[in-house]
Design a protein with these regions (language model features):
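Nucleic-acid endo/exonuclease domains
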Residues: 1-124
């Protein structure tokens, strides 16, 4: 096998694993919070922006900010500026956007934060 094939194989395995992990979070939302959570939810009618997770019924979004310690896309200047634009537009559209890290995604604090948001009406 050449290096490119090995690289593609590793990448597809990593993508599959991430997808399975995210499905677990949507199940947690359903069982613990009693709401439908959608992964990769497209919220803007014109832009290709997506939330990592969304609870559309309550207009609550959860963004998982990866690469915090490794200079990932969200922490580099261009990625950060893009996120600012995305989050501001989402807020103007009435969304409440919460941010977390991959490490904190399944923690009780994150689930409790979403629970409080669901039980607290958003005042426009």
């Amino acid at each position: 096998m050449n290096r490119q094939v090995i690289k593609k194989t590793k990448k597809s395995r990593q993508t599959a694993n991430k997808s399975q992990i995210r499905d677990v979070f949507t199940v947690i939302c359903k069982t613990d919070l009693g709401v439908e959570c959608v992964k990769e939810y497209k919220f803007h009618p014109e832009r290709r922006w997506r939330f990592d997770y969304a609870i559309p019924e309550h207009k609550i979004a959860l963004e998982v900010e990866g690469g915090v310690w490794t200079q990932g896309r969200h922490t580099r200047p261009q990625g950060f500026l893009g996120d600012v634009e995305k989050y501001n537009q989402a807020t103007l559209m009435g969304w409440r956007v919460f941010r977390t890290t991959p490490t904190d995604l399944y923690r009780t604090t994150t689930i409790n934060l979403l629970k409080m948001a669901i039980n607290t009406p958003f005042l426009p």
